[in-house]
Curated annotation (Swiss-Prot):
Subcellular locations according to the entry: Cytoplasm
InterPro entries named in the record: Metalloenz_LuxS/M16, Pept_M16_N, Pept_M16_Zn_BS, Peptidase_M16, Peptidase_M16_C, Peptidase_M16_M, PqqF-like_C_4
The protein's role, per its UniProt record: Has a role in meiosis.
Record family assignment: Belongs to the peptidase M16 family.
Gene3D superfamilies xref list: Metalloenzyme, LuxS/M16 peptidase-like
SUPFAM superfamilies documented for this protein: LuxS/MPP-like metallohydrolase
Protein's name in the database: Putative zinc protease mug138
EC number assigned by the record: 3.4.24.-
Cited Pfam families: Peptidase_M16, Peptidase_M16_C, Peptidase_M16_M, PqqF-like_C_4
Taxonomy of the source species: Eukaryota, Fungi, Dikarya, Ascomycota, Taphrinomycotina
Organism domain of life: Eukaryota
Cited PANTHER family: INSULIN-DEGRADING ENZYME-RELATED, NARDILYSIN
Residues reported in the UniProt entry to bind Zn(2+): H68, H72, E149
GO biological process, one term: meiotic cell cycle
């Protein structure tokens, strides 16, 4: 014996995707902690995650939110590392991030860090599960943080719907409990009961945080033996308390909770019908996953489906069907249908049609064939799965380890269906009975009967029994001939082959393979990931794009009409790993198609042909126009971040339209206008395109040529090709634009503090801006969020508003927006003094961390494609921008950086160009702080017109001067 902690090797290796070149070893430490070690010699970042098999369902009823509070306070220092910011500072100085979440049955903690800093991060991470301090002085602050997190969800319909599922459940069930926690449940209630919340938290931690119900994943470059030694050394001290995994015998729904309908008025302007079925637990049925299979059929959107029939009748626009595991013994299936006005009026007919389809499922003998298609695609997706960022992989796999999968096939069985289980499928279908569901009907027009109020979200709702005669009619329903099971899926790929060739010199950027008056085509044959997939982007650039608000909403409506017309055709493609999206751009319409190359060309040609041949059906037009009008109205209920983001874009770009302008414009868009509009939009087009993946240059040319021929446009003159420009904020400019939140129930205000720095082609300023964000992000978070408790959402980011690079600070809070701006100014004052005191070592660490981030390799094809397309769309075509800026960062001195900060970021800087967007809650309008030397923007359009426009974004080099020798590493 050498004194090392004992380790049991459970299994070497895992069944993995074809392209997964990592090494795996599953071990168990002497304290019963199961650890999956993953060696990835190519990873830039290392990671670890611990999943604890305890979540919100284990909260004591007198301390709701305690598990979530534990997740928060756990990070506030340990005996070995008592500084509450030590962990975060270590990660930030090594290009790291961390996060955690509390779910109903588990709590998951994870981090990512530069590969060479893994041991130090593991040491700090392990201490949270060995000897956390749960500092008394942090207690109240973190209760407020939990409360702030809850407050940000108060006006979220998704959170409110989920809470209603709980409210309508069996009151004896753990599912009925409020999970998040707030200042009442963690502050006021414990005081009233004479409870010390910190002492109760210590009891909770001591009772449940045991090594035997934890799962750990470690990903690093080091050999497995080294990772194993680190795991044993650092994590064996976690105590094993032999804790049993909690069981929850009370069912979430009994006969008392079904056959009811709940009426609720949502925050957003939506019309939604949720049908919820309690079903037997599916936890142990991972080989077939019967409920998942049944949801696949209920949520199908192809020919003969429930949704297709509803759409043909003008009753619905979309739906989603899903199952949720509530406890080990109980699941629910939810069919959530988004209704038209007619569907809302006749919602009982919608329910009847659902039960017609369920009857079809009950009578069919085709499940084996349909299941086999699903199984084939799950296998294909698993075999061709690419890597994801290390932290994403670690925390997902850690939660999967909690399941009872065979230990050498944890990754496989969590992804692939393997066994057809007709009895299991029938058991689920038989649970979808007319006497075994409850409904939630939500719409803005619902006013009467909302005589119940939910305590924690303030949801007003009504509840009544479903009519017994209606239930009886569902028991004797017959299936319409319009409903039938899915046909054979023509998009299932036959070939998953990739001709993998040795590559000595990898392509660094895409190659320009066609550039004429009709098409500019960039192509890169994948030489890194070797998957049988591709990503294709086409920007159909039109001279009339964004010409007016009416053109803008008409373009959006046109893309929606195409997607709607192709819904039944394209849905099977999505099941077979092929997806497309159409979205309006500042210059036209962008088509993105991604997936297996075997059938990608078929979908591409179908979509482009529909763009050309679309026949606008008046009923579908009115339904989709109404839906878009609802979305524009829902801007009033938009989260503060998205609202401020939209306003900043509108203020910055000459052809960006305000929500009010778009709302007014859509009123004038009529079905009779669309034919001429489509003709005008497509008459002159230039196709800017990128093909990246498992396609040769010849394949790429043929793909884009087919799109061009289908549209057959006239060329766009060079003078008609608009390029991106933005307003120039004058040096020394200090502007505030205020927008009041119309929703009177919204407690939160917010500020987007935006600093316009330089044009994107100014590489040195870009490097300095990124370094500023690197240095500022941790102190901004720890000061504004942790210490000052301004709000749950606090971040800094580098933002691109072409052609400019910007630095943003965002805070959402229950305090007023002027107070938030005053605290950001105080923060900048603090930075000003602290930068002078920063050691050379700390400055060097920040530079190294940023350089590591900027030089990170892409982890999958999508990441790489998205970066190329972003560089194409910004108009500079600078595919190596980050690499060049990384070189510049290495040369930046403290003096240069300090001068840059003082002149360009501090609010008194002579070159500082600042616009802050204030999103103002009506609940805190009275709290006003004076901001000196500021100009209030009273009228956004007049402000834009008074500003000088930037020069347009142009390629760094003329296209005919691109040197092919520079394309390679």
């Amino acid at each position: 014996m050498d004194g090392k902690p004992q380790v049991e090797v459970i299994v070497n290796g895992q069944v993995v995707p074809n392209l997964d070149d990592r090494e795996y070893r599953l071990i168990k430490l002497e304290n019963d902690l199961e650890v999956l070690l993953v060696r990835d010699p190519e990873t830039d970042n290392a990671s670890a995650a611990i999943d604890v098999h305890i979540g919100s369902q284990s909260n004591p009823r007198e301390l709701l939110g305690l598990a979530h509070f534990c997740e928060h306070l756990l990070f506030m220092g340990t005996k070995k590392y008592p500084d509450e910011n030590e962990y975060r500072k270590y990660l930030e100085s090594h290009n790291g991030i961390s996060n955690a979440y509390t779910a109903s049955n588990n709590t998951n903690y994870y981090f990512e860090v530069s590969h060479d800093a893994l041991y130090g991060a593991l040491d700090r991470f392990a201490q949270f599960f060995i000897d956390p301090l749960f500092l008394e002085e942090c207690k109240d602050r973190e209760i407020r943080a939990v409360d702030s997190e809850h407050c940000k969800n108060l006006q979220s319909d998704s959170w409110r719907f989920w809470r209603l599922y709980s409210v309508l459940s069996n009151p004896k069930s753990v599912f009925s409990k409020f999970n998040t926690g707030n200042i009442e449940t963690l502050g006021d209630v414990p005081k009233e009961l004479g409870l010390d919340v910190r002492q109760e938290l210590l009891k909770f931690y001591d009772k449940y945080y045991s090594a035997n119900i934890m799962k750990l994943v470690i990903i690093g470059r080091e050999p497995l033996d080294v990772l194993q030694d680190w795991a044993a050394e650092l994590f064996s001290p976690i105590k094993n308390k032999a804790v049993p995994i909690p069981k929850f015998p009370d069912p979430p729904y009994t006969d008392n909770e079904v056959r009811k309908i709940c009426y609720v008025k949502p925050v957003k302007n939506l019309r939604r019908l949720d049908i919820v079925f309690p079903i037997p637990g599916q936890y142990h049925k991972y080989k077939c996953r019967p409920a998942e299979y049944v949801c696949h059929l209920l949520g199908h959107e192809g020919e003969g489906s429930y949704l297709a029939y509803l759409k043909s009748l003008g009753l619905a626009t979309s739906l989603i069907a899903f199952n949720v595991s509530i406890t080990e013994d109980a699941d629910i299936i939810v069919v959530s249908t988004f209704l038209t006005e007619e569907g809302l009026t006749d919602y009982q007919r919608v329910i009847k049609i659902l039960f017609e389809y369920i009857r079809l499922l009950d009578q069919t003998n085709a499940h084996k064939f349909l299941f086999e298609e699903t199984r084939i695609m799950s296998e294909a997706q698993f075999k061709t799965r690419q890597k994801t960022p290390a932290y994403q992989y670690a925390h997902v796999v850690a939660s999967k380890l909690q399941r009872e999968y065979p230990r050498d096939k944890v990754l496989y069985y969590s992804s692939v269906l393997t066994e057809f289980d007709p009895k299991g499928i029938q058991e689920v279908v038989e649970s979808l009975r007319p006497n075994n569901f409850f409904a939630i009907l939500a719409a803005h027009s619902i006013e009467k009967g909302l005589d119940n109020k939910e305590k924690f979200y303030g949801i007003d709702y009504g509840l009544e029994d479903l009519d017994s005669q209606f239930i009886d009619s569902l028991l004797h329903i017959k299936t319409s001939s319009e409903l039938y099971l899915p046909l054979a899926n023509e998009f299932i790929p036959w070939s998953l082959e990739v001709e993998k060739q040795p590559v000595t010199t990898k392509l660094k950027v895409p190659n320009l393979v066609r550039n004429d008056k009709f098409v500019r085509l960039w192509h890169k044959k994948d030489d890194t990931f070797w998957v049988p997939k591709a990503n294709v982007f086409i920007n159909f650039i039109s001279p009339i794009a964004r010409r007016s608000p009416k053109v803008s909403v008409s373009t959006t409506l046109y893309t929606r009409l195409i997607e709607d017309a192709l819904g039944e055709y394209s849905y099977p493609a999505s099941l077979a790993g092929l997806s497309f999206s159409l979205s309006p751009s500042t210059r036209g319409i962008i088509l993105c198609i991604s997936g297996f190359t075997d059938k990608l060309h078929v979908l591409l040609e179908k979509v482009v042909a529909m763009m050309r041949d679309l026949k606008v059906h008046p009923q579908r037009f009115e339904i989709l126009k109404n839906r878009l009008e609802q979305e524009l109205k829902d801007y009033d209920a938009l989260e503060a971040y998205h609202r401020s983001n939209h306003v900043l874009t509108w203020l910055s770009e000459p052809h960006s339209w305000s929500n009010a302008e778009l709302r007014e414009a859509i009123k004038d868009v009529q079905v009779g206008d669309m034919s001429d509009f489509i003709s005008d939009l497509l008459k002159q087009n230039f196709l800017e395109s990128l093909v990246h993946g498992n396609y040769t240059e010849e394949d790429a040319k043929n793909l884009i040529e087919s799109a061009q021929k289908l549209i057959d446009p006239k060329p766009v003159f060079a003078s008609q090709l608009s390029r991106k420009r933005a307003i120039i904020v004058p040096e020394g400019g200090n502007y505030i634009y205020k927008t009041v939140v119309p929703n009177k129930e919204e407690k939160n205000s917010a500020i987007m503090y935006n600093l316009q720095i330089s044009q994107l082609d100014d590489e040195r300023s870009g490097a300095l801006t990124r370094l500023a964000r690197q240095i500022m992000k941790e102190p901004t978070f720890s000061i504004l969020r942790t210490k000052e408790q301004l709000g749950y959402i606090v971040f800094t980011l580098v933002r691109q508003v072409t052609p400019f690079i910007n630095l943003n600070i965002f805070v959402q809070s229950e305090r007023s927006s002027t107070y938030l701006e005053s605290r950001i100014r105080a923060l900048l004052d603090q930075f000003k003094s602290e930068f002078l005191e920063m050691s050379d070592e700390d400055f060097s660490k920040h530079k190294s961390s940023l350089i590591n981030f900027m030089l990170e390799k892409h982890t999958n094809l999508k990441e790489e494609s998205s970066m190329y397309w972003l560089r194409i769309c910004d108009g500079f075509y600078d595919f190596t921008r980050l690499e060049k800026q990384a070189e510049i960062v290495s040369t930046i001195t403290k003096d240069e950086f300090y001068s840059f900060f003082i002149n360009n970021i501090h609010y008194e800087g002579e070159n500082t160009k600042k616009i802050s967007v204030h999103v103002v809650s009506q609940r805190c309008e009275d709290e006003v702080y004076e901001i000196p030397n500021v100009t209030i923007i009273e009228n956004g359009n007049m402000f834009k017109e008074s500003m000088t426009l930037s020069k347009a974004a142009f390629p760094l080099k003329p296209f005919d001067e691109i040197d092919r020798s520079l394309l390679f590493n």
